[in-house]
Amino acid sequence: IYEVLEPDDRQPGWRNRSYLAKYDLKTGLLQPLTFGYHNVWAADISNDGRYLLMMTSQSRLTKRPTTLFSLYRLDMQTLQAELLIDKDGFISGARFSPDGTQVLVSGSPESLGGIGKNVKEGQTPSMTDGQLYLLNIADKRVTPLTKDFNPSVQRAVWNKADGQIYFTAENRDCYSLYRMNPADGKIQQLEVSEDLVNSFSLAQNAPVM
């Protein structure tokens, strides 16, 4: 007799779970950080190495969305975990601000209670429309950064050198490159010769891309 929890439970390896561990490059010691029946993965590490953003997932087949994600901040010194976002099926990632006091959250318009929705009442926004949100860790206040920005955000990086957020977005038939000031939310498209900017990399201590 076998208990099948959900359709995917028939697939080999479905019950395998991922966990996080800290590896000390100096001593070679490996310290497990998480354990349990939920998959856990790292979203980002603060610049000072003190905090870790980690996400977990769990299934909920009775209603949309069927997969829920939670976001935690783990103190690497005390191993205390702080819940930042609980069971949100529409977030997809998170990154620390350069000073570690804020979190840049990516997801669809329905993320975080639908604060990023920009459609008529009764309409459901596209789950593939990428949006950015700013979460203040101290008071958990969330600000939608791209609610009135039409292109769909793909990949975003918060630059340490100038404090600006750089991201690519699906702009009609192009993948364009943009820069955002997180202080006022102003977005500027960067003029580059390529129509399809698939990836980019930033220097941490210099204004170089």
Annotate each PLM feature.
Residues 1-19, 34-40, 55-71, 83-92, ...:
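A flexible loop/linker signature enriched in serine peptidases of the S9 family
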Residues 47-48, 98-99, 160-161, 203-205:
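Residue-level detector of Asp-centered blade-edge/turn motifs that repeat once per structural unit
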Residues 30-49:
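A conserved hydrophobic secondary-structure block that centers on an alpha-helix together
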Residues 24-28, 75-79, 136-140, 181-185:
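Short loop/turn segments that connect beta-strands within beta-propeller blades
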Residues 16-30:
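Thioester-forming pentapeptide GCGEQ
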